[in-house]
From Swiss-Prot:
Organism: Bacteroides thetaiotaomicron (strain ATCC 29148 / DSM 2079 / JCM 5827 / CCUG 10774 / NCTC 10582 / VPI-5482 / E50)
Protein name, UniProt field: 2-C-methyl-D-erythritol 2,4-cyclodiphosphate synthase
Family, per entry: Belongs to the IspF family.
Cofactor: a divalent metal cation
Role played: Involved in the biosynthesis of isopentenyl diphosphate (IPP) and dimethylallyl diphosphate (DMAPP), two major building blocks of isoprenoid compounds. Catalyzes the conversion of 4-diphosphocytidyl-2-C-methyl-D-erythritol 2-phosphate (CDP-ME2P) to 2-C-methyl-D-erythritol 2,4-cyclodiphosphate (ME-CPP) with a corresponding release of cytidine 5-monophosphate (CMP).
Gene3D superfamilies: 2-C-methyl-D-erythritol 2,4-cyclodiphosphate synthase
Length: 159
């Protein structure tokens, strides 16, 4: 069996007038994330980590923000396409370990649904997806609630 590890990072600005999508679910919040797609920072981070693990560049290469077809796209579609892309090289998702960094909204109660949603999109077990939420103790842009960032480490494998 061959295994590879990938790392992803993404950040999006919080703005008024947009819905907040994280981990494939819509959250009630006064602001949403700015981006060409639905700006789901967690799913984008996981896509980048998966693509990096398979040595297939990054999310911007495969789904450029200059392409009209990706305007306001549901990031679950991008995640599904990413899993399909790594499958062309014989890889499948082993596990995911991700961290969301945001002051608000508080995310703990939403994590199980994020795990279930992401697992359904990728065709893996929810127990293979770890999602943690933290703050920066009011420091930096996330601490000032100007944006949300996310980090992910993934393991992909093939026989």
């Amino acid at each position: 069996m061959k295994i590879r590890v990938g790392f992803g990072f993404d950040v999006h600005q919080l703005v008024e007038g947009r819905e907040l999508w994280l981990g494939g679910i819509r959250l009630e919040h006064s602001k949403g994330l700015l981006g060409h797609s639905d700006a789901d920072v967690l799913l984008h981070t996981v896509c980048d980590a998966l693509l990096g693990a398979a040595n297939m560049r990054d999310i911007g290469y495969h789904f450029p923000d200059t392409a009209g077809e990706y305007k306001n796209i549901d990031s679950k579609i991008l995640l599904k396409k990413t899993v399909e892309l790594i499958a062309t090289k014989g890889y499948r998702v082993g596990n995911i370990d991700a961290t969301i960094c945001a002051e608000r909204p508080k995310l703990k109660a939403h994590i199980p649904l994020m795990q279930e949603t992401m697992a359904a999109v990728m065709g893996i077990d929810a127990e293979d997806i770890s999602i943690k939420a933290t703050t920066t103790e009011k420091l930096g842009f996330t601490g000032r609630e100007e944006g949300i960032s996310a980090y992910a480490t993934v393991l992909i494998e093939k026989d």
